[in-house]
Amino acid sequence: MATFSQKPAEVVKKWVLIDAEGLVVGRLASLVANRLRGKHKATFTPHVDDGDNVIIINADKVVLTGKKYTDKKYYWHTGHPGGIKERTARQILEGRFPERVLEKAIERMIPRGPLGRRQMKNLRVNAGPNHQHEAQQPEVLDVAALNRKNKGNA
């Protein structure tokens, strides 16, 4: 019997809604990365975009454990000599785009390549409680109920 290999035409995608309020960033990011890749399905095929579409709301209310809120640094380079820049997680969460902390955590758990970039397009992260995808009738996924450690104590 040959190993099952799913074709792109056979893929069935669902829409999943996750409320990130009070959830630990890393635990939520690993669960979402697995959903985006499709690894939670028995039909997972490494070279096919088999994952679900994920909508995350309240991304500005995520929790970082330990001292990561003040100590974790996000680096980027401007491209100019000496152009290394850094911001702490606190500065980003209190800044203009607080959802980027969660986006970066998920992005860094997905393989970097053409398929990974396509899978990241199936992710929608909103800082507030609203989203524009009611028409897709997303299924609500209660991440806090999956494991007691998923809920932060902040």
From Swiss-Prot:
Superkingdom assignment = Bacteria
* Sorted UniProt keywords: Ribonucleoprotein, Ribosomal protein
GO MF term list: mRNA binding; structural constituent of ribosome
Q: Does the keyword Metal-binding apply?
A: no
Q: Record's Gene Ontology CC terms?
A: cytosolic large ribosomal subunit
Q: Gene3D superfamilies attached here?
A: Ribosomal protein L13
Chain segments annotated as coiled-coil in the UniProt record: none
One BP term from GO: translation
Q: List the disulfide bonds.
A: none
Read off the Pfam families from this record.
Answer: Ribosomal_L13
Q: Which InterPro entries match?
A: Ribosomal_uL13, Ribosomal_uL13_bac-type, Ribosomal_uL13_sf
Which ranges does the record mark as transmembrane?
none
- Does Iron-sulfur appear among the keywords? no
Q: What is said about its interaction partners and assembly?
A: Part of the 50S ribosomal subunit.
Its job: This protein is one of the early assembly proteins of the 50S ribosomal subunit, although it is not seen to bind rRNA by itself. It is important during the early stages of 50S assembly.
The UniProt entry, under HAMAP family, shows: Ribosomal_uL13
Q: Which family does it belong to?
A: Belongs to the universal ribosomal protein uL13 family.
Name of the molecule in the record = Large ribosomal subunit protein uL13
